[in-house]
Each structure stands twice: as C-alpha cells, then as structure tokens.
Regions:
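Cytosolic-side membrane-entry/anchor segment at the start of a transmembrane helix
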Residues: 1-36
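Hydrophobic alpha-helical transmembrane segments
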Residues: 2-12, 55-68, 85-92
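Long, highly hydrophobic alpha-helical transmembrane signal-anchor segments
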Residues: 23-61, 119-129
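Residue-level micro-sites within transmembrane alpha helices that shape
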Residues: 34, 68-71, 75, 100, ...
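Membrane-embedded alpha-helical segments that form the functional core of polytopic membrane enzymes
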Residues: 54-74, 84, 139-149
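Membrane-embedded catalytic scaffold of the fatty acid hydroxylase/desaturase
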Residues: 77-212
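Conserved small/polar residues in nucleotide/adenosyl-binding loops
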Residues: 216-224
Length: 224
C-alpha cells in the first residue's frame, strides 16, 4: 500500500475498547524496569544453580546479543513488513508495525507494550530452554538485552537528534526507511545486515521525502 501522507503528529487508534487500547502503549522506563531485573536474576540463577563457567556464560550472553541483531533484521523485513491478501494478517501487520509507519513519531508505540512483551519473552525463554537447556539462562538475558538496546535506539532515532556524529548514519538509514523506501534499510540498531543482504541505502545520494512514504502493508487499520 501507499500512504498519501504519513502523520508526524498524532496517534493511531488500534482498538475502540479503552482497555485494549491502553495495552498497546509502552515506554522506555516501563520496559527497562520490568525486563532488566528479570535478566539479571536469570543470569545469576544460571550461574549459581548450573555452575557453568562464568567465561562460558558471558560468551553465550554476548553471542545472543549478536544473534539479536540478525533476528532484528529478519523480523523487521519479513514479519513486520508482511504482505498478505488475508484481512486478519493485514490487521496483524498494521497493529504490529504498520501503525508505526503511519504515525512514526508516536513515542508511546516505539517500545513493545509490557503485557505483550512479557508473553513473548516468556515463550522465547521456553524455546531457548528446550533447544539449549541450561545455556538458555545466559542466552535469554543477552537476547532480550539486545532487544532493549535496539528499542532504545529506535526510540532515540524518532525522538531526538543523533547525540554523536558517528551515529548519524543510523538516523539517516532509518529515516530513509520511513520517508523514502520501506523495502530498504531494515536495520535499526546497526546496518551490518543491510550491507550483508544488499538492502543498505546509499546515504550519500538518497534524500528522504518527509511528506509521503511508499509502504507496502495493505491498509487494515480500522479500529475494532
């Protein structure tokens, strides 16, 4: 689809039910406050109860952070930008990510809301534990910390100017994704995988159009 104009002010209404609508909003403080203590406890529990070497745990932990960057790219490209003729999938795509492209500066929807995020990370821990057993207690904290850092970077990109000059390419890459071509520039916390998979913008040549944006999600944002 193509939005005739994106809205740099305002907020999409996803549900008519006020309770459900409230569950679609979050903040950096809520996300860090909820998840960071869980990550610390999880890592400590794994260390104390499984007696894994601390060096091994940190290798798994930092490996998980790197794996998050790959997951971030794949999820953004193939799940958040899902294209389908199915109305339910269209609706899912708009709730998950399409509303953010429609209202990119809505700060209340730059972080995943607390309730959905807790459900998702609990399911992820279960999957990690089934696959890697005790190593999940190091992998899970690294993976979720990667998500928190990504979400914080995403929030900063939409809420403020880059604090350091070397970070400007990240800002430009994501702004081009929103305001120029949403089929490129899927990396948010980094551009490594965009370079690997050939979806990197030429930052020296491209200029974003802040009034219109090509967006291939099918329109399905009517409220329930």
């Amino acid at each position: 689809m193509k939005f005739d104009k994106i809205n740099n002010k305002g907020q999409a209404q996803l549900f008519e039910n006020k309770f459900l609508e409230a569950l679609t909003k979050g903040s950096p403080q809520l996300s860090w406050g909820i998840h960071l203590p869980i990550l610390i406890f999880c890592f400590y529990y794994g260390y104390k109860n499984y007696q894994m070497p601390l060096g091994t745990m940190f290798m798994v932990f930092f490996g998980a952070i790197f794996f998050w960057t790959f997951f971030e790219y794949i999820a953004h490209r193939y799940i958040f930008h899902l294209i389908s003729e199915n109305p339910k999938l269209q609706r899912f795509a708009y709730i998950m990510h399409g509303n953010h492209h429609h209202y990119p500066r809505d700060r209340q929807r730059l972080f995943m809301p607390p309730v959905p995020s807790l459900i998702i990370v609990a399911a992820l821990f279960g999957i990690f534990y089934l696959v890697m057993r005790e190593y999940a207690f190091a992998f899970y904290p690294g993976f979720v910390l990667g998500w928190l850092m990504y979400a914080s970077m995403h929030y900063m990109i939409h809420a403020m100017a880059p604090p350091f000059k070397f970070m400007k390419p990240l800002w430009r890459n994501h702004h081009l994704h929103h305001y120029k071509d949403e089929t490129l520039g899927f990396g948010v916390s980094n551009t490594f995988w965009d370079k690997v998979f050939g979806t990197m913008f030429d930052l020296k040549k491209e200029k974003e159009d802040k009034e219109t944006v090509s967006y291939t999600h099918l329109r399905a944002h009517e409220t329930l």
